[in-house]
């Protein structure tokens, strides 16, 4: 089992893995219903990807670039498993959290700023709903176990990952269907992503 973690602050890594074959089994620590094949893996800041792989050669991790690749690392493989048993890759145990019900309310959080991002109402380079840096008061307050739909709107010229502390949420597909269960979603430039979250963990949590 191999876990990839993007610990960078703002770099999105498109990765290519060589020397292994297998499937993605979890995203941000939450098991997928069905393990997925992979070729290239895109991992945004704070995101995690878990794989179960069969190692056939030296593991090579390359970052894909416009004009080639940059080698991030290599893991040498030594010895041979003489008792190897071939079996299908099964799904990991599912989260005990049920899929949330219909939302009690719907909110919108708009990211603005940065180079080519245009003016906004904040007083720094970036803003969320026209507020820069930490607000004087929490953006919103929720009752325990309240289900909320949030539209994350990226009006900047760059893709941006949004990470919610203390909770996981469901990404919603364009048709409204429930997608992956994770705590960090990548939003493309001039794009948006709807998420559905049941706020069941009391506390003061950052969304960044």
Feature map (PLM): residue ranges:
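Active-site pocket scaffolds in enzymes
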Residues: 24-37, 108-208
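Histidine- and aromatic-rich segments of cupredoxin/plastocyanin-like copper-binding domains
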Residues: 1-103, 172-188
